[in-house]
Amino acid sequence: MFGTSVSALCLLFLLSVCTACYISNCPIGGKRSALAFPSRKCMSCGPGDRGRCFGPNICCGEGMGCYVGSPEAAGCVEENYLPSPCEVGGRVCGSEEGRCAAPGICCDVEGCSIDQSCTEEDEAEYISQSVSSSHGHDLLMKLLNMISHTPPHRVHK
């Protein structure tokens, strides 16, 4: 009889530990409070705060393109420490929950890629002015490839 009650008590203890929030992933107010937070815009970033954070080291905006792993995007790390989720806006693009970040560029939390679905008629004019001919497209592809292979800049204290 005593063994059964101890087993039941241990089972209840393990169950409570398994369903508990941990310090790193528990929102303020408990697990169910995450749905109570209203969505908000992601933090501003980049030159003149004209961009929005798309990930911990990605800052993109209309007319400025995207900064990945650069000092302009360094402030985006703070987004990880805020208790409520944010939305960057823009159309859904890419295969992994990406959003249109700038004309012709789709970004998610991990990185950015060229995506033609992010190009509208008025945005196509912006691209043709800033990047001319297929040579410009090749240059943009090389830059995106370089950015994805270079480690982010680190600030050492």
Swiss-Prot record:
GO terms for cellular component: extracellular space; secretory granule. The modification Glycine amide is found at residue 29. Pfam families: Hormone_5. Its main location: secreted. Seven disulfide bonds are present in neurophysin. Residues 1-20 form the signal peptide. Keywords: Amidation, Cleavage on pair of basic residues, Disulfide bond, Hormone, Secreted, Signal. Disulfide bonds join 21-26, 42-86, 45-59, 53-76, 60-66, 93-106, 100-118, 107-112. It comes from the Eukaryota. GO terms for molecular function: neurohypophyseal hormone activity. It is found in: Secreted. Isotocin causes contraction of smooth muscles. Belongs to the vasopressin/oxytocin family. PANTHER family: ISOTOCIN (PTHR11681:SF5), NEUROPHYSIN (PTHR11681). This is Isotocin-neurophysin IT 1. It comes from Oncorhynchus masou.
